[in-house]
Amino acid sequence: MKLQASWSLIAVALLAFRADADGTAWDLEIVPLKPGIYLLQRPEPLRQPVEGNVLVIVNERDVVVFEGGGMPIAADNAIRLIRSITSKPVSHLVNSHWHGDHNLGNQVYRAEYPGITIVAHPATRAAMLGPPFKYVTEFDKDVGPTITEWTALKEKGELSERRSRLLDDLNLLLTDAKRIAVTPPDLTVADELVLHRGEREIHIRHLGKGNTEGDLVLWLPRERIVATGDLVVHPIPYGFGSFPREWIDTLAGIEALDFELLVPGHGEVQRDRSYLELLRTMLAAMRVQAADAVAKGLDLEATRKALDFSAFAPKFPQDDMGKRLFEAWWTSPISRSLWLEASGKPIVQADAGENN
């Protein structure tokens, strides 16, 4: 997901924030997966601001990391944990796609590991250097008014505990945003790159469009682990600026891999194909509905109202927070992409966060 805080998402953030949440939104913990393979994961995947999973691959002489973190502080935390695992240097950092919650820590890795190679798809590099990344310079404009308002309420003792904790994260976000120096990849992969590390092969592949134009996955055939970026997000998918038809094919490509563990862009590791199949089935069904809506001449808003996700919604979190996040993160944005696709209109990445 594009890390943005032009917070109609403030309301969403409140939904996804527990008053008793521990630490900051960028704290991570180590989850060993297999020998030499570790997941750095935030315990609460639905918490805002969002923060993605980081896959760490410790080889004989170096370390390969998949995902650069959503803020400099996230990269600080990840590197601290990596160094608690090994003293070996990080040689390669892979960004799965252009959304900032996967790469705004790149410059921290570059500073800590000067010889590092940052890898991404050409479309990711273009987005990071172009209009889609304009929002990175606008955190103060987006978050500042809310911080000012809530700080005044807190001083008067009128701010709820939930908002007070979220205010702490927003202040930290705004402070840390001053450290951001957009650091695009210096090696781009349009199809596949294979890193050979002894008996280990690390495949970095573009299987097709999906969540964005330039999604990369990382595949470890010997260990049977695939990391998908935001092509798969659990327990609620992200649908911002996505490509429904191609996404179905890309998910099928992931499903065809002989994986044992699937590391999503956010959320819990998947140990079977059921969630992957759910996403693919849902996208296929909604494409049929969108085509029917457009054939009837419905515009975007009418199509949004006509699309019926009720057959799939019960398979996602059903508490009040889950239902609202399912609408904010999935049904509303993916409906736009479904309508654009069915109408034969282009899906432009720069528009992904502006017209959801």
State where each predicted segment sits:
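Boundary at the C-terminal end of the N-terminal hydrophobic targeting segment
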Residues: 16-25
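Core dinuclear metal-dependent hydrolase active-site scaffold
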Residues: 178-184, 188-220
